[in-house]
Amino acid sequence: HQTNLYRLSINLRKAWMEARDLLPDILREHFPMPPILVKALCNKMNLYKKISHCWNKLIILDSSKNAREAVELHQRWPSRVKVVLLTRDGRGVYLSRRSSGRSQSESVSGWLKYYQRALPLLERYIAPDSLIKIRYEDLASEPERMGHLLCNFVGICFEPQMLDLSSISRHLVNGNDTRFSPGKGIHLDERWRTKLLGAELEFFQRTGGSMNSLLGYR
C-alpha cells in the first residue's frame, strides 16, 4: 500500500529529474541524481552482468523505453551502453489507439509527450556512435537489412537465424499478445494510409505533424 509520504517522495524525485533535464550542462553536474535512483541504475547493471554470465551472452538487449534511464546508464558506462530508438509513424500509432476506443487527444498525447522528452535527451547526451534510430516500417519491410545495420552497430556478425524468434528459448515479461504467438513475427501495418482520412487525419497533422516530421516521416 502506497502511503502519502511515499507518493510525495516519488513526485519530488520526478520533479527534480525533470528540472535537471532542462539545465545547461555546466549546471547539470551540480544537481546529481537522488541516491536511490543511482542505486537503481547500479542494480540494473548488476542484473545485466548476472544475465550475461548465466546465459553466456556478450550482448543484453533491454527493451525498456525510459529515455532518461538510458541516458544515465550511458553516461555512467559509455563504452558498454548503446541506445536504439525505435520509432513508428505517429499516424499508425494514432489510428491504432483510436481503433481501441481512445479519444483523439488520448490517441496522440502519449506518443507525442514521449518523443518530446526522449528526442532532446537522447540527441543531447548520447554519443553519436552509441545512438541509432530505427524505423518500425523499415524493420518490418526489410528485416535482414535492418538486422545487418543493428549488428554492425553493436559490433557483431549478422546471422539469418536471428530473425527466427521461434528457434530460440525466450523469457518474456509483460508485452503484447505476440508473446503467445512465437511464429507470428513482425508484419508491416500501414492501415493508416487508407483508413486515416478527413477530420481524423487533419487532427493528427495539427497536433502531431511537427513531431512526425522530426522523426523523419512525411
Where does each model-flagged region fall?
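PAPS-dependent sulfotransferases, especially Golgi type II membrane carbohydrate sulfotransferases
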Residues: 23-32, 36-39, 98, 119, ...
